[in-house]
From Swiss-Prot:
This is NADH-ubiquinone oxidoreductase chain 6. The chain crosses the membrane at residues 1-21, 47-67, 83-103, 130-150. It holds the Pfam family Oxidored_q3. It is found in: Mitochondrion membrane. It comes from Strongylocentrotus purpuratus. It catalyses: a ubiquinone + NADH + 5 H(+)(in) = a ubiquinol + NAD(+) + 4 H(+)(out). GO terms for molecular function: NADH dehydrogenase (ubiquinone) activity. InterPro entries: ComplexI_Subunit6 (IPR050269), NADH_UbQ/plastoQ_OxRdtase_su6 (IPR001457), Nuo/plastoQ_OxRdtase_6_NuoJ (IPR042106). Its main location: mitochondrion.
Amino acid sequence: MVVYVTLIVMLFGSTLVFYSLSPYYSALGLVVFSVPGSFVLSFLGSSFVPIVLFLVYIGGMLVVFPYSSAISPERFPSVNNLGEVVGLVFLFSSWVFMSFDNFQDLKNIFHCFVSGESLVGSNTFYNSGGVLVILGVFVLLVALVGALIISRGIESTIIRAIWLW
């Protein structure tokens, strides 16, 4: 029953990200999504990956949230179509309850991903990803500079309103 509740909370967090036009609720939705996601991964048998996932989500939100809130022109944001969000959560949560009779079957499916019984070692898995990590850092740096340039020219953003006050 606990796993079902965590899946429903993950569903609520993801729909909050998709249906909110404001960065405030999107950041909240990602944090709401990361906590039960880490819990489900720890339930499946992994111990290190959920901690890394949670820290990456929280660290990413600490970087993205100030810049996205600087760009946002709304002082008091709201979630659009909150009734649709609640309806989708109810629809998909009923689907989750009807689909999984026994969650242990799902645990056996994902057991090969979190255990040490894979054919490829972790050294081979992480060895070829160094170039992609450097490329990802460069793309995030370009996006950060772009967000700063965009927010610098706008006079009606939240941070500009606080500075002018």
